[in-house]
Amino acid sequence: MGAEQSGDADHKHSDFSASVVPSPAKHRAKMDDIVVVAQGTQSLRNIHNDPDVIKLQEIPTFQPLLKGVLSGQTSPSTVCLEKLDSAQVLQLCVRYQDHLHQCAEAVAFDQNALVKRIKEMDLSVEALFSIMQERQKRYAKYAEQIQKVNEMSMILRRIQMGIDQTVPLMERLNNMLPESLFWMLPMEHITFALDCLSYAWIRCFLA
């Protein structure tokens, strides 16, 4: 009976081990994990014939004008600056001078045009001012003459009032005279004499 139990245990252990061992399909490696170490058919690149490398080699090396301003340098005073080519600097200065000269010529041309226009405007303003002055003088004379006319009208009204008051008095005086001193004049003659007197007085006033 013990032999049977041991036989059964061995049979169960073999069955369990057979069930635990994974199948070869589960241990199949993925394509990403495969590394090929064999030499391929592609030929090696020659860096000497590479166009990108050739272009990089054609770029000249250069340094900044002020090497001391670089962040990696701690003592810029010890760095010796490279000298610039005087011919190129002179050419740069000459071109800049030509540019400034052209700008100055353009500004001078515009300035001359503005000055000419300002002179023309000054002449126009002066001519207009002279015309306005002459017109103002003419109107001042007209105003003075109108003032004289107003004064003359007032004088004539006063003279007319004086004549109107004088004629009845002269008539009364003429009627009161005796016959020996009677000097009867027509009223038209008396009025005409007074008008002539007033006219002469007005001419003296206007002169």
Curated annotation (Swiss-Prot):
Q: Where is this region: Disordered?
A: 1-24
* Keywords recorded for this protein, A-Z: Lipoprotein, Lysosome, Membrane
Principal location class: membrane
What CDD domains does the record tag this protein with? BORCS5-like (cd22789)
Q: Which InterPro entries match?
A: TBORCS5 (IPR018780)
The record's Pfam families line, in alphabetical order, gives:
LOH1CR12
What's in the GO CC field? Answer: BORC complex; cytoplasmic side of lysosomal membrane; membrane; synaptic vesicle membrane
Q: Report membrane topology.
A: Lipid-anchor
Subcellular location(s) of the protein? Lysosome membrane
List GO BP terms, alphabetically: lysosome localization; organelle transport along microtubule; positive regulation of anterograde synaptic vesicle transport
The entry assigns this protein to a family as follows: Belongs to the BORCS5 family.
What function is annotated for this protein?
As part of a BORC-like complex may play a role in lysosomes movement and localization at the cell periphery. Associated with the cytosolic face of lysosomes, this complex may couple lysosomes to microtubule plus-end-directed kinesin motor.
Its recorded name reads BLOC-1-related complex subunit 5
